[in-house]
A protein has these predicted regions:
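Class I S-adenosyl-L-methionine
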Residues: 1-204
Length: 205
């Protein structure tokens, strides 16, 4: 089975803590699936506004790399030699997400765990019993998990007014008079009898 070298996933910020009654269940299922397919994983909850964008949008980014990649091999070797220290440095400085979105500090509390310590027969058992608390950043290498809360190196957000164009509006943004009937029909209410390929009729609205 051919697998991609790199996987980038994006989801809502609450993914790491969902669902409320089984905190972390959904995210731990994702980690388990990627681990079983031979991937190392790093994740971060990122607010676009913290890095200068004119939008307050928090999203969870999951970056996975397969065990055939150079970055996987380098991290695996570092973890073997330095243990948690290298995992912490990966989250804070060396990771793909840390390089793209720098952080300035971290919480004192952290989570260390092994995904293999969670014993279950299959994914359905995880869905019923899994409950784990993880922070807004972390890394998993060969089933070993390290997670910590990080504070971003904030860049002053760009006000929306600075992004709006104030000059003349190009003509191609306006509807032409001759196109109005087609737009009126497309956007307006309708109830038309149409025919399927098998000859039966249906009402299109």
């Amino acid at each position: 089975e051919k697998r991609p070298k790199y996987v980038l996933l994006e989801n809502v910020d609450r993914l790491i803590r969902s669902p409320a009654k089984q905190s972390g269940r959904d995210f731990s299922i994702i980690l388990r699936c990627l681990y079983e397919k031979g991937y190392a994983v790093e994740w971060r909850v990122i607010n676009a506004a913290d890095y200068g964008y004119a939008q307050r949008r928090r999203r969870t980014f999951i970056m996975a790399y397969h065990n055939q990649t150079e970055i996987f091999c380098n991290l695996a070797e570092a973890v073997c030699v330095q243990g948690l220290k290298s995992m912490h440095k990966h989250v804070m400085e060396n990771g793909i997400l840390a390089k793209a979105f720098p952080v300035q500090s971290h919480s004192r509390s952290y989570v260390e765990s092994w995904i293999d310590e969670l014993e279950y027969a299959d994914i359905s058992t995880v869905s019923r019993n899994q409950r784990v608390y993880l922070y807004n950043a972390g890394v998993m290498m060969n089933g070993r998990i390290y997670s910590v809360d990080v504070t971003p190196q904030r860049i002053e957000a760009t006000p929306l007014k600075d992004m709006l164009e104030t000059g003349p509006v190009d003509e191609h943004y306006f509807l032409r008079t001759e196109d109005m009937p087609r737009w009126t029909y497309s956007k307006g209410a309708k109830r038309e009898k149409r025919q399927r390929r098998d000859g039966s009729q249906y009402c299109f609205s």
